[in-house]
Amino acid sequence: MSDVTIVIPNYNGIAFLKTCLDSVLAQTGVQMDVIIIDNGSVDGSQEFISSNYPQCELVCLDQNYGFCRAVNEGINRAKSPYVILLNNDTEVRPLFAASLVASMKEDKSRFSCSARMLMYTKRDLLDDAGDFYCAFGWGIARGKGRPKQEYETADQIFSACGGAAIYQTEMVRLIGGFDEAHFAYLEDMDLCWRARIHGWKSWYEPDAEVFHVGSATSGSRYNRFKVLHSAGNNLYMIYKNMPLAQMLLNLPFLLVGFLIKYLFFVKKGLGKDYREGLARGFELCRKNKDRKVRFLWKNLPAYVAIQVELWKNILLFLPGRREN
């Protein structure tokens, strides 16, 4: 049995596939399987993979079902104890996979471990060193745009970034996998939040380096698609993972946070899209009540720890503050 399965979702990403797959297949120090889930690409991706990378398992879906459906397909096919999710617009270092596997083996309570993601064109700058979330309802990619030397230490994070992270295969299955109602955006944070409720940890491993282009599938950093899905998924994620008492406790913070976000997107010309996204979020909550995490008293210590972190992480947005 392989040590790890690398799952790569792809949608019309033929321009990135050679760089990504060549670097993946050059991994050392680990036995691995590679599964590529193609979301109905029409740019020749499927033919390119079949012709040039027969050692990879290619699964072709009939249309674009989004990130969550794609990676769930890969996770369900994985036969290894660990699964790595990797964006197609990446290039990984030779010890990327081995470093992630070693980190997970160090501590069996680790549900996930995020790689050190570096900008593809500015390779000394960070793209993501794990994700955080605060009581304002804001997520933050830790270290984005900072020199990579500032994040040399492995430590605990709120959530692994699903663009380059490793997970315990059986634990992902146990807590229900990625929620396909998300389609794309914040699905990785939702998954790690659920794991946190059950007492599991997410970690950051700087030795696992990956270079990331970013926004290769969806386009620019701020666009209608991203704003619409991110706003709705954020509201849905809060509803799913917070018991009623916790939602009420955070309501003043969330109202302020959502208002600030709305004003920000109004200035970007995307205010209408943000409102539509929130409306979509309420609809997701209504349609998926059965997916709300059931409160159990045994998980109360985890809820308390999460809440303290949500408050603490507000400080990360103050001027001059840097994430630890």
Annotate each language-model stretch with its function.
Residues F158-E209:
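A short, conserved alpha-helix in the catalytic core of glycosyltransferases
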Residues L125-L126, W138-I140, R146-Y167, M189-L191, ...:
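A recurrent flexible, glycine/aromatic-enriched loop bordering the glycosyltransferase active site
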Residues S23, D38-E47, Q63:
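A conserved acidic beta->alpha catalytic loop
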Residues L61-A78, N88, S99:
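Glycine-rich, basic loop-to-helix element that forms the pyrophosphate-binding segment
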Residues M247-N324:
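Non-catalytic, C-terminal membrane-associated alpha-helical segments of glycosyltransferases
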Residues T90-Y133:
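Conserved donor NDP-sugar-binding/catalytic core segment of glycosyltransferases
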Residues D22-Q31:
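Short, acidic, metal-binding catalytic loop of nucleotide-sugar glycosyltransferases
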Residues V83:
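Short aromatic/hydrophobic "clamp" motif used to bind/position activated sugar donors
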